[in-house]
Amino acid sequence: MQSKYIWLNDKLVNYADATLHFLTPGLHYGVAAFEGIRCYKTARGPAVFRLREHIDRLMGSCKVMGWRQLPFDAAQLIEACRLTVQANGFQECYVRPVVYQAEGGWNLTTDAGKPYVGIAVWEWNGYLGAEAQEKGVRANVSSFTRHQPNVMMTKAKIAGNYPNSVLAKTESVRLGFDEAIMLDTQGMVAECTGENIFVVLDGRIVTPPEGSILCGITRDSLLHLARDLGHEVTAQPISRDQLYTADEVFVCGTAAEVIGLREIDFRVIGSGRTGAITRSLQEAYHAAVHGNHPRSAGWLTRVESDGRAGRTLDDHRVAV
């Protein structure tokens, strides 16, 4: 089903009419903050996964970007996301809110103009291919290094950060791989182009520390789910050679969900298929996003209006 409407500065406009001027500063300089969010079909209707956490991160990205005042607060953006999904009639979709420099900014400062906000939704059919979750995918260690935090603010999801990922992913695909693993400036594992990474070493789940990575909402979800399942989880530096000798390696992100890596740099990882721990986390995550997990109530925001805009399914959580 085609998207019908896009939300722009508090108005739903027809999909075809949601256009930008060629000289929009955010287009030229990457001065935009955004989020990638998923809406899933549940027994109680469509619901957005961890919407509040995504919008909180968006607000943090805007603060890092230097905007002193935004046209909408977090509660209004949560409601706008819900309304946009509802207006388009989707049961499952991808949700993309963007805050961008729309006016001024030619002197390379966010103080010269003002930000606008848009929210788009579209149907989502998977990111790394239909067989990725079952069989896992192939990855390489990229020749491109992940940003150092004082070069590009790595905790902010900012458009200008993403050419780093585009270069690495393009190289990876042209070499015949599905995804790229990026190292930090110290040569330790950071993350993939659009996902965080986990490694299973001697039965322990290990993930890189927060230093140079974008702290993913899916990553945070898996940390909770893994501990719920009784797994030991540690954030610690991971070397490149530990990737090759790991029992399992898996990546996670809003778009990819949870995907095993069956091969890295032509080296088979574990059994060469999605491992048991990865599989258990896939199942727990899928249950959570579809409303079938004990954590679902606190993590899902219903799309259908119940008079309490933006409230989660958990009636005990405070409404925004």
Q: Would you name each region that the model predicts?
A:
Residues M1-F72, Q76-L83, G105-V320:
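Helix-start/capping segments and mature chain N-termini
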